[in-house]
């Protein structure tokens, strides 16, 4: 589905202009303040709305608006069980860590999570270790965010002849940097997004990130609620959607090439992605654009999906399917491991699965994921940083209530919207991460307001951007503060720190951009892996460090190390040894659960095998509160 006019593009450009304007205003805001505190924490001045929306917008990343919708689209209603505990994670994160982190960060002057660990355990080594681990995992986490944004840009601009020509020219000019197997329109969209987000993050700092998070938080919830209304209307109501889904069978996934009887004419032949075509009585849909280059007779293999449900085939072909300018040749088709030929699998757990005969979400795994999101969300360093930047306990209490409501208004509607997407946009199962922008166009055009697609697309774009800017800034702050200032040049001037921060932010953006040149099929798997890894590495050391006086440096190192080793090993066995996309789950429990338990055990063993902390540290972290500190 592509735009039929420029109205959605104009709306999207206006949104982007507002984001850049906020960065410019923010840059002026911190010129007369301490650079590090303002650039990386906004001078610790977050109020209720700012705290709730920057916390929520950062948490609601590409996983919420690309990976999560793609899994709903692929597996159906079982995703409601999968995401359920995300509604309570703000209570866990803000309630358990918020007050203590705020007090301690002000006492110690800490700006980053490694800052807290260095002050608590009097260990520069631990701070460097945590910085390195955070930087690696967050750089990996950024790849899905960049991928989603590039897919949105491709969907928004892909029908423009100028955009198509520039994309092809870019790949011709930079063949060494851009893989020839990559879709040039995707690559061009990726570079446009990277330029936008890196420029405004570098220029505006934490305050720009918070201001844009507030804007993006409103855009996200408004976009989701509008999509919910349009989706329910266009499928004829939830009862009708449920009845249709109960009759659906999972599709079959395969590849195809397209041939000509004679060489292609000048400029070649292009068949758009999402094009329907028939081979005999079988119905297929392309999931990638087809290019037959000038002077050639055959395209490269592209992904196609075969529709298997009889009523879907009848409905789609009722008005006829257009003839293709080339002949399709199907190379292979793969049935689902669970659900192939079965009706109703989208309506009940464990849901259909292309690779797992047990389905997507067996009961034990559903229980495991209820613990997963509460732990993973609480253990994210990006959330901890925001808990170091609010104004007082009253702000924290109100933000918790606001954020729980905010997540309810996003995640449950998303389940409904993208179950409806199986009826409104069938046949995208090979590239399900594109379902969000595709649905934005389908719903806005179906509602007779095509310009609204630009606003609806801004919701997932905002989710990716709000996560990217926060994570880039957090990596940059840890590198500048914990590596450069603390270990290399303690007497660095404000000017030097500013330019080192700018350069680091730019470098991180470049790394994530190159990583996104090879996008995975399911973004959510990367997000789950890296999000879980961050929680395993940081939740136990930080929580034990701020609440347990006996906890010491050896305990923190063993906690972090043993947790990550166990967590990574379970993924390694699944990914490499068993050649499976999913990790090994002993007793049906996710690796995060085992990693977190190992982290707690490692922390306990390391603590009691070595000595206690210094009196100075105990006084600083567990003594009387500062007279001016609001902890009421």
Predicted regions and their residues:
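Membrane-embedded helix-loop-helix hairpins and adjacent transmembrane boundary segments
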Residues: 1-632
């Amino acid at each position: 589905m592509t735009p039929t006019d420029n109205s959605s593009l104009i709306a999207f450009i206006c949104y982007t202009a507002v984001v850049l304007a906020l960065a410019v205003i923010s840059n002026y805001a911190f010129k007369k303040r301490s650079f590090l505190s303002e650039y990386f924490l906004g001078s610790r001045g977050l109020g209720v709305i700012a705290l709730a929306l920057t916390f929520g917008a950062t948490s609601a990343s590409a996983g919420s608006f690309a990976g999560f919708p793609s899994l709903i689209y692929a597996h159906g209603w079982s995703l409601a069980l999968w995401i359920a505990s995300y509604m309570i994670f703000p209570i866990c994160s803000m309630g358990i860590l918020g007050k203590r982190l705020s007090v301690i960060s002000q006492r110690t002057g800490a700006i980053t999570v490694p800052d807290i660990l260095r002050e608590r355990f009097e260990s520069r080594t631990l701070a460097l270790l945590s910085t390195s681990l955070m930087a690696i995992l967050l750089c990996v986490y950024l790849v899905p965010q960049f991928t989603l944004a590039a897919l949105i840009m491709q969907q928004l601009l892909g029908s423009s002849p100028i955009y198509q020509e520039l994309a092809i020219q870019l790949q011709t000019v930079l063949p060494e940097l851009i893989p020839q197997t990559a879709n040039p329109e995707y690559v061009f969209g990726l570079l446009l997004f990277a330029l936008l987000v890196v420029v405004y993050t570098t220029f505006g700092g934490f305050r720009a990130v918070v201001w844009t998070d507030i804007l993006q938080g409103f855009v996200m919830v408004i976009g989701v609620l509008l999509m919910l209304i349009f989706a329910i209307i266009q499928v004829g109501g939830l009862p009708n959607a449920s009845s249709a889904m109960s009759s659906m069978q999972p599709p079959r996934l395969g590849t195809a090439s397209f041939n000509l009887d004679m060489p292609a004419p000048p400029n070649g032949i292009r068949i758009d992605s999402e094009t329907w075509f028939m081979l005999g009585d079988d119905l297929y849909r392309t999931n990638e654009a087809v290019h037959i280059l000038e002077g050639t007779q055959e395209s490269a293999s592209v992904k196609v999906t075969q529709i298997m449900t009889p009523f879907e085939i009848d409905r789609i072909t009722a008005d006829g399917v257009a003839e293709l300018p080339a002949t399709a040749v199907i190379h292979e088709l793969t049935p689902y491991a669970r659900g192939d030929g079965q009706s109703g699998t989208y309506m009940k757990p464990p849901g259909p699965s292309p690779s797992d005969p047990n389905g997507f979400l067996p009961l034990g795994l559903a229980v495991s994921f209820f613990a997963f999101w509460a732990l993973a969300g609480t253990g994210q360093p990006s959330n901890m940083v925001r808990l170091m930047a609010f104004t007082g306990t009253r702000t924290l209490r109100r933000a918790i209530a606001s954020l729980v409501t905010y997540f309810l208004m996003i995640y449950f509607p998303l389940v409904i919207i993208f179950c409806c997407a199986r009826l409104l946009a069938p046949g995208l199962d090979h590239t399900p991460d594109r379902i969000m922008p595709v649905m934005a166009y389908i719903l806005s055009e179906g509602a007779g307001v095509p310009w609204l697609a630009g606003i609806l697309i801004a919701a997932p774009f905002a989710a990716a951007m709000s996560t990217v800017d926060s994570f880039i800034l957090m990596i940059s702050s840890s590198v500048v503060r914990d590596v450069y200032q603390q270990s290399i040049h303690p007497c660095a001037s404000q000017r030097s720190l500013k330019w080192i921060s700018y350069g680091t932010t730019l470098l991180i953006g470049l790394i994530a951009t190159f990583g996104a040149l090879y996008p995975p099929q399911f973004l959510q798997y990367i997000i789950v892996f890296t999000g879980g890894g961050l929680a395993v590495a940081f939740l136990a050391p930080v929580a034990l460090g701020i609440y347990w006086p006996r906890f010491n440096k050896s305990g923190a190192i063993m906690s972090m190390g043993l947790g990550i080793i166990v967590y990574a090993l379970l993924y390694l066995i699944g990914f490499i040894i068993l050649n499976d996309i999913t990790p090994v789950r002993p007793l049906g429990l996710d690796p995060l659960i085992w990693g977190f338990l190992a982290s707690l055990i490692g922390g306990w063993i390391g603590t009691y095998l070595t000595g206690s902390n210094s009196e100075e540290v105990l006084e600083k972290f567990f003594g009387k509160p500062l007279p001016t500190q609001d902890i009421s």
